[in-house]
């Protein structure tokens, strides 16, 4: 997992 993918998921949750 890279940071960009993690941020994309976090944005969807938030």
From Swiss-Prot:
Top-level taxon of origin: Eukaryota
Any one GO molecular function term: toxin activity
UniProt keyword list: Amidation, G-protein coupled receptor impairing toxin, Mast cell degranulation, Secreted, Toxin
Annotated GO CC locations: extracellular region
Signal peptide: none
Cross-referenced InterPro entries: Mastoparan (IPR013213)
Localization terms from the record: Secreted
Sites of Leucine amide modification: 14
Tissue spec. comment: Expressed by the venom gland.
Protein family according to the UniProt entry: Belongs to the MCD family. Mastoparan subfamily.
Summary of the function given for this chain in its UniProt record: Mast cell degranulating peptide. Causes hemolysis of guinea pig erythrocytes. Its mast cell degranulation activity may be related to the activation of G-protein coupled receptors in mast cells as well as interaction with other proteins located in cell endosomal membranes in the mast cells.
Protein name, as recorded: Mastoparan-C
Source organism (scientific name): Vespa crabro
């Amino acid at each position: 997992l890279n940071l960009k993918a993690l941020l994309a998921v976090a944005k969807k949750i938030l």
